[in-house]
Amino acid sequence: MAAERLDPWGAVEIKDYDRLLRTFGIRPFSEVLPLLRKAGMEPSFLMRRGIIFGHRDFDKILEAKARGERVAVLTGFMPSGKFHFGHKLTVDQLIYLQKNGFKVFVAIADAEAFAVRRIGREEAVRIAVEEYIANMIALGLDPKDTEFYFQTNRGTPYFRLIQLFSGKVTAAEMEAIYGELTPAKMMASLTQAADILHVQLDEYGGYRHVVVPVGADQDPHLRLTRDLADRMAGVVELERPASTYHKLQPGLDGRKMSSSRPDSTIFLTDPPEVARNKLFRALTGGRATAEEQRRLGGVPEVCSVYHMDLYHLMPDDGEVKHIYTSCRLGKILCGECKQIAWEKLERFLAEHQSRLEKAKTIAWKLVEPPRF
């Protein structure tokens, strides 16, 4: 974390999550686990395993829910590439919260895709609908209780917030949070703040208790948004949003997972033979020889195949613990471990892709694409 900053647009690799908690004032998620049950919610395996490791004010959201007040969750996706397992990690959290009574809002960051990534408008719309929205529906997000929207189509009150926010923060303050910024990134940051806060307006449902689940690298946007909510007092009353933070799933090459490096991730639309080849070439924590691994054991902490099990393929805690222990004790070799993961991945992809074409048809009916 150079100069104690996180870059939400860059290839951030975070090694020390405890330091991140200390540096940026994020609270450990473990402290809200008892409150989940009071709110009638069983912790998900992502929560139990510490993959969701931190929060800001999520305890207040749970207390509001326990009082019977309306709660919502909002996230956004920039349509700049194919939908991969890193994206699925966020959607799994949306599905969990939706099943527990949260209204879901999903922003399609088409303005940011154009300004920051230079994605053509028509291409951004196609990617948004056929890759992101369709995959979310196929994963199990209920479209009847989800509001999808394009940033550039959202309406006057939303854009009014962006304009007013621009008068509540200086360029120097934004650079202290983000580092050097282009005009496009400044605009994208203010727009993301509007995404997070606008659902509190009556025109968009008046949801005062909102949580935003993000990867740890996205925290700068939350810090800016919380400051802006405070500074809008006297203009429009906005509550600080809550947030939860998940660890970034390593790519198959050990670096940050990215659509721009196709071999670093498995896309949810990959044909079986492509997905299998990627998985079997993935970085592992194995030793140089089978004999050495049996003697010394493997290192699952740096194994991208184990991370696929941990984050996605093995919701049963006992099963994933067995894989971890067997690797550590040298009782299982990498080839066998990959085969176990592949059998689960193959089944998941087959079932998911069988739902995808129908989901695409539904997805096009859910949103109004921007005219230009």
Swiss-Prot record:
Which molecular-function annotations from GO does this UniProt entry contain?
A: ATP binding; tryptophan-tRNA ligase activity
- Enzyme Commission identifier(s): 6.1.1.2
Q: Which GO terms describe its biological process?
A: tryptophanyl-tRNA aminoacylation
Q: Where is the composition biased (Polar residues)?
A: 257-267
Q: Where is this motif: 'KMSKS' region?
A: 256-260
Write down the Pfam families for this protein, in alphabetical order.
Answer: tRNA-synt_1b
Keywords, ordered alphabetically: Aminoacyl-tRNA synthetase, ATP-binding, Cytoplasm, Ligase, Nucleotide-binding, Protein biosynthesis
Catalyzed reaction equations? tRNA(Trp) + L-tryptophan + ATP = L-tryptophyl-tRNA(Trp) + AMP + diphosphate + H(+)
Location(s) in or outside the cell: Cytoplasm
Q: Does the keyword Protein biosynthesis apply?
A: yes
Q: Name one GO cellular component term.
A: cytoplasm
Per the record, the similarity remark reads:
Belongs to the class-I aminoacyl-tRNA synthetase family.
Cite the PANTHER family for this sequence: TRYPTOPHAN--TRNA LIGASE (PTHR10055:SF5), TRYPTOPHANYL-TRNA SYNTHETASE (PTHR10055)
What is the name attached to this protein's record?
Answer: Tryptophan--tRNA ligase
Protein species of origin? Aeropyrum pernix (strain ATCC 700893 / DSM 11879 / JCM 9820 / NBRC 100138 / K1)
